[in-house]
């Protein structure tokens, strides 16, 4: 491959294949963009991780929770067995917090939920799981406690793909003011030229991955055309397109990660962006 004429390389899509390419000396001086996978890639020279890393999003959400939760709140943490380290970190951040562990079958004991959610102070519940079954059962049980006397808000420090399952009720999440960080904002683009052309060609509206790919390519093209190189384009700062933000910052060994994100909340059957 003649690498002299390459401004950048996008992909491969699979993490294993991307790591192999980034390890090759022939490509060491060429920017290499990891496009779609949320799995961490090897951060070698010239690597751009375009998906905001999970640990970064979690750190930012912890900072947000610290700003909005105080001693007047009743903090309850619901964490499964794979997220006990986050439970511990939350306990250290909120010393008065109470932990609830799901039972076998991913449900919460109704009597325990009823006794821990109070009407004397706001209830701030933090759900730490990436399992659809627990998200569904826990959010439903928590919603059943909501009343004029009991004020409940729901949060998570990491909004994984399980939360996007179409079988989950947006109405339920709206009732709980479910708040989280995300590397994308699922607002409608149905009337845009891109969406119309996509439907005309493929017969269906673009999904999350198609929109992500479009936003990423447009961003990379604009960065190179205006700044001559991807490395120098980090001086631009944050950019935003249909559903995605890009804010590349140095990581290590001349690599870069995207620290663009949205702080989102379910409200009135919709998802809105709130101030960070």
Give the residues covered by each predicted segment.
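A short, well-structured beta->alpha microelement
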Residues: 1, 96-119
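Periplasmic-binding protein-like
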Residues: 2-14, 33-35, 74-80, 120-138, ...
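Sec-exported extracytoplasmic/periplasmic mature domains
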Residues: 2-3, 23-27, 66-70, 95, ...
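Extracytoplasmic/secreted envelope proteins and their assembly/folding machinery
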Residues: 6, 18-22, 58-62, 87, ...
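Extracytoplasmic ligand/sensor domains, especially the bilobed periplasmic-binding protein
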Residues: 10-90, 164
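Glycine-rich, charge-decorated loop segments at or immediately adjacent to ligand/cofactor-binding or catalytic sites
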Residues: 43-48, 110-114, 161-174
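Extracellular/periplasmic periplasmic-binding protein-like sensory domains
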Residues: 139-212
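Segments of small-molecule ligand-sensing domains
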Residues: 203-213, 221-275
């Amino acid at each position: 491959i003649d690498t002299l004429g390459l401004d950048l390389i996008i992909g491969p899509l699979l993490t294993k294949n991307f790591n192999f390419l980034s390890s090759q000396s022939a490509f060491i001086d060429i920017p290499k963009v990891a496009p779609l996978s949320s799995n961490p890639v090897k951060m070698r020279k010239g690597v751009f991780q375009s998906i905001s890393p999970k640990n970064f999003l979690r750190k930012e959400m912890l900072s947000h929770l610290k700003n909005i939760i105080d001693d007047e709140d009743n903090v309850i943490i619901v964490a499964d067995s794979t997220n006990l380290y986050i439970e511990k970190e939350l306990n250290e951040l909120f010393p008065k917090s109470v932990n609830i562990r799901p039972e076998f079958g991913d449900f919460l004991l109704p009597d325990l939920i009823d006794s821990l959610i109070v009407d004397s102070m706001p209830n701030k519940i933090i759900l730490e799981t990436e399992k659809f079954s627990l998200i569904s059962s826990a959010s439903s049980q928590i919603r059943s406690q909501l009343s004029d006397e009991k004020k409940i808000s729901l949060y998570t420090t990491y909004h994984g793909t399980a939360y996007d399952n179409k079988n989950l009720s947006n109405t339920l999440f709206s009732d709980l003011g479910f708040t989280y960080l995300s590397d994308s904002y699922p607002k409608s683009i149905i009337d845009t030229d891109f969406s119309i052309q996509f439907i005309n060609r493929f017969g269906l509206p673009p999904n999350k991955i198609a929109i992500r790919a479009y936003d990423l390519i447009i961003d990379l093209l604009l960065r190179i055309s205006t700044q001559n190189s991807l490395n120098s384009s980090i001086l631009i700062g944050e950019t935003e397109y249909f559903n995605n933000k890009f804010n590349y910052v140095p990581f290590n060994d001349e690599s870069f990660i995207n620290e663009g994100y949205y702080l989102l909340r379910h409200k009135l059957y919709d998802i809105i962006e709130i101030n960070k």
